[in-house]
Design a protein with these regions (language model features):
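Short intracellular "coupling" helices and adjacent cytoplasmic loop segments at the cytosolic face
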Residues: 2-5, 96, 104-128, 132-134, ...
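Juxtamembrane loop-to-helix connectors within ABC transporter transmembrane domains
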Residues: 11, 19, 87, 91-95, ...
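An intracellular "coupling" helix at the cytosolic face of ABC transporter transmembrane type-1 domains
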Residues: 24, 115-116, 132-141, 145, ...
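Transmembrane helix-loop-helix hairpins at lipid-water interfaces of multipass membrane proteins
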Residues: 26-86, 163-168, 279-283
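Hydrophobic alpha-helical transmembrane segments of ABC transporter permease domains
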Residues: 31, 35, 39, 43, ...
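Alpha-helical transmembrane segments of multi-pass membrane proteins
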Residues: 31-32, 76-95, 146-153, 174-198, ...
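Helix-loop-helix
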Residues: 56-68, 161-175, 245, 249-318, ...
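ABC-type nucleotide-binding domain
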Residues: 332, 339-586
Length: 586
């Protein structure tokens, strides 16, 4: 995963459109924020009036006036509470909705990314980006516009009122603000860098834990618990070091703010006292001045405290953008059409291919014709490109040169959904989703009737063993199907393809990991599955492909032998050597 870095301006520009759907809520949130701010700024004015009037002529200050001011302030407090409730409720809901929208966009984009992306990216990193990182965006989306809006209002109004009370003193106070902001911006930049490292390390830690837990059987089999603990401790220790650095920057940040807080209070205390002694500011004005300065400093402190949340949110947005900006390498052409009822005739015309991260060509000018309904087996040494060849047909990868035709048309002319919808794949490493057997079979055709699911299971030879289970089709298979045997999982995956009912079948070493009994049952199911369909079979067990219409021997030099079993045995070439070696091992 490319860890591209974005400027703050670019992050705001990319994030802002997510507020578009919630403009009314945002405007109401800011309006309520303005109300709470105004309510808060009225109290010092009331205190100023009472103090000045009391010192000027205590007898003129009636109880009625004080009660009137008290009722006014109480009314403003009620307004403040109602506005605050809206901010806390609807404002946070808006943030949660934006987080949900971003997570949806990230997940939808991940669905479109090619195998190359997943080959080069740790799942733990991806999980961290679409879960933990976006949690911080909820608070950021709510508080960021609100906090800066409130700060802007309070700063402007406070400056106007303070300047009206005593301009020289106000200028002294506000001279401290640019200096404080400059220092804080430097520390903010360092905090952002630390938070970025922290998030990356969390992803590495998640990937380490996931890898170890998924491979727990291998860990136990090799008694390597201590080795895994050492790896974990190393990654965990790195995370701690990064977090220490983050807290160090945060401590420096908070200390700087407190220092400037004290400096501003000191200016008011000393300069304000001198102005009062010289009669340039009234006592009531100085009281109000202190209250407004306290409000101003509290606002600045609130923004400073928000800085940590701000940096977390910006880091979360940045890591989100690194997902949605990942290039989609396999996509529909602008004029792509739906593939309907294909016959299944496949042609490779001068196909060359190399993986994006490896410049060594797997194929060079490969030509191959597969007739509709033909059963073709592909054998050869490991690393010869058998699986790669089959992965090119459903466009899990695109050819580097040449083209692949389906029924005489370039496969790129068809939409990915319709192309892959007409191809069924049974792999050696069966992946079952966490859920029931019924849910896993119906994955082949979502929305299929129960009768169709059961019929697919019967044709795959899975129905009998399913019914022997306590919960039948409602049996929970566990994560990746761990509660089932290899043969059972394979037959469920075959049932899934039966339900899909595609005209083209790819069998990628579908029986190589099974015992003899399971292989016999699965081979029978595969035989029925391939009947009447264009079938490509990759196999190491040559006994499973003897009845293929045609067998191809694929090596680094391309297709070096071709024919049925008897023809290849007569040639006494590579296939003959493979077959004799397999028999000798038996």
């Amino acid at each position: 995963m490319e860890n591209k870095q974005y400027t703050t301006r670019e992050l705001f520009r990319r994030f802002a459109p997510y507020f578009k759907k919630y403009r009314f809520t945002l405007c109401m949130d800011l309006f309520c924020a303005a109300l709470t701010t105004v309510c808060e700024l009225v109290l010092p004015l009331i205190m100023r009036y009472i103090t000045n009037e009391g010192l000027r002529d205590l007898a003129a200050l009636s109880v009625k006036t004080i009660f009137t001011l008290g009722i006014l302030y109480f009314g403003l407090r009620i307004v403040d509470c109602i506005a605050g409730y809206y901010i806390s409720d609807m404002g946070h809901v808006m943030g949660a909705k934006i987080e949900t929208d971003m997570r949806r966009d990230a997940y939808n984009h991940l669905q479109k990314l090619s195998n190359t992306y997943y080959n080069n990216t740790k799942v733990g990193q991806i999980m961290g980006r679409i879960t933990n990182d976006l949690f911080d965006v909820t608070e950021f989306a709510h508080h960021c516009p609100e906090e800066f809006f409130i700060a802007g209002i309070k700063t402007v109004i406070s400056f106007v009122i303070l300047a009206n009370i005593n301009l020289p003193l106000t200028l002294m106070i506000f001279l401290c603000v640019p200096l404080m902001c400059g220092v804080c911006m430097i520390l903010n930049f360092r905090m952002r860098s630390a938070f970025r490292k922290q998030r990356n390390q969390i992803g590495e830690l998640n990937a380490r834990i996931e890898d170890s837990l998924l491979g727990h059987k291998v860990v136990k089999a090799f008694t390597n618990e201590e080795v895994e603990n050492e790896k974990f401790e190393k990654d965990n220790g790195t995370f701690l070091d990064i977090k220490k650095l983050t807290y160090r920057y945060m401590a420096a940040f908070n200390t700087t703010v407190k220092l400037f807080d004290g400096l501003m209070y000191l200016v008011v205390l000393v300069a304000g006292g001198i102005f009062m002694v010289r009669g340039k500011i009234a006592a009531g004005d100085l009281v109000a001045y202190m209250l407004y300065v306290s409000t101003l400093i509290a606002t600045i402190r609130r923004i400073i405290e928000f800085a940590e949340q701000f940096q977390r949110g910006m880091t979360g947005i940045e890591r989100f953008l690194q997902i949605v900006d990942a290039d989609i390498e396999i996509f529909d052409e602008p004029d792509a059409v739906e593939l309907k009822d294909p016959k299944g005739e496949i042609s490779f015309e001068k196909v060359s291919f190399e993986y994006p991260d490896d410049h060594n060509k797997v194929f060079t000018n490969l030509n191959l014709q597969i007739h509709a309904g033909e059963k073709v087996a592909i054998v050869g040494p490991s690393g010869g490109g058998k699986t790669t060849l089959c992965n090119l047909i459903p466009r899990f990868y695109d050819v580097s040169e040449g083209k692949i035709l389906l029924d005489g048309q370039d496969i790129k002319r068809f939409t990915l959904k319709s192309l892959r919808g007409n191809i069924g794949i049974v792999q050696q490493d069966v992946y079952l989703f966490s859920g029931t057997i019924y849910e896993n079979i119906s994955y082949g055709r979502p929305g299929a009737s129960k009768e169709d699911v059961i019929e697919a299971a019967k044709r795959a030879g899975a129905h009998d063993f399913i019914m022997e289970l306590k919960d039948g089709y409602d049996t929970y298979v566990g994560e990746r199907g761990v509660k089932l045997s290899g043969g059972q999982k394979q037959r469920i995956s075959i049932a899934r393809v039966f339900l899909k009912n595609p005209p083209i079948i790819i069998l990628d070493e579908a029986t190589s990991a099974l015992d003899n009994e399971s292989e016999f049952a699965v081979a029978k199911s595969l035989g029925e599955l391939s009947e009447g369909r264009t079938t490509l079979t990759i196999a190491h067990r040559l006994s499973s492909i003897r009845n293929s219409d045609r067998i191809l021997v694929l090596t680094d030099d391309g297709i070096v032998e071709e024919g049925d079993h008897d023809q290849l045995m007569e040639q006494k070439g590579i296939y003959y050597q493979f077959y004799e070696t397999a028999n000798a091992l038996k």
